Amino acid sequence: MTATAPVITIDGPSGAGKGTLCKAMAEALQWHLLDSGAIYRVLALAALHHQVDISSEEALAPIAAHLDVRFISHSGEIEVILEGENVSTEIRTQDVSNTASRVAAFPRVREALLRRQRGFRELPGLIADGRDMGTVVFPDAPVKIFLDASSEERASRRMLQLQEKGFSVNFERLLSEIKERDDRDRNRAIAPLVPAADALVLDSTTMSIEQVIEIALNYAREKLALV
């Protein structure tokens, strides 16, 4: 880990467009990328595969401490590797996503994964995608962005994303799950989903992803004095 490597944190709720924004910024700046949400999904998947009780913090903590996860950039996409296996598609199912939100609420699990996430900080810089990147994981990050959107818009985006991957989804159920997840994430005792005090807050509800990327890149370059 290089303590001097700059970090740009992108926080926000599920479906706001963080993943697309982070990939675009990482490519534009040629920086490393951390999808912290993927780490929690990988943990959720590992727990499901090993039939670990996802309601047991004691059972989950050691799995989190020794989680073998890597991110590999390949053909413009980020491959998520768990114990040598590409699980990029498997971790994006709604069941795994909902499980990830539940396991993320445990303090010991977050502590174990916190150390792992900070290990991704390397030169020339890191784009960190998550929910508490700017408030907990990288509080010293020079650039912090909080990306939001209405729950209805996020449900629509998620439905299209899942349909493109061949999954059958119900909009009302998806919207309900997103609202429930928002409530858990915003009101949990440990690292709730809130913008950092010094974050730029972007509401992408009525914005194209191209507009969001342009605003975020211009803001980051200005803050970091990048050409």
Swiss-Prot record:
UniProt cross-references to InterPro entries, sorted A to Z: Cytidylate_kin, Cytidylate_kinase_dom, P-loop_NTPase
Q: Where in the cell is it found?
A: Cytoplasm
Q: Which organism is it from?
A: Erwinia tasmaniensis (strain DSM 17950 / CFBP 7177 / CIP 109463 / NCPPB 4357 / Et1/99)
Naming one, the record's GO cellular component terms include:
cytosol
Which GO terms of the molecular function aspect are on file?
ATP binding; CMP kinase activity; dCMP kinase activity
Main location class: cytoplasm
User: What is this protein's gene name?
Assistant: cmk
Residues folding into a coiled coil are none
Binding-site residues for ATP, renumbered to this chain: G12, P13, S14, G15, A16, G17, K18, G19, T20
The EC code for this enzyme is: 2.7.4.25
Give the record's family classification. Belongs to the cytidylate kinase family. Type 1 subfamily.
HAMAP family named in the record: Cytidyl_kinase_type1
Q: Output the GO biological process annotations, alphabetical, semicolon-separated.
A: nucleobase-containing small molecule interconversion; pyrimidine nucleotide metabolic process
Q: Which UniProt keywords apply?
A: ATP-binding, Cytoplasm, Kinase, Nucleotide-binding, Transferase
Protein's name according to its UniProt entry:
Cytidylate kinase
Reactions catalysed, as given in the entry: CMP + ATP = CDP + ADP; dCMP + ATP = dCDP + ADP
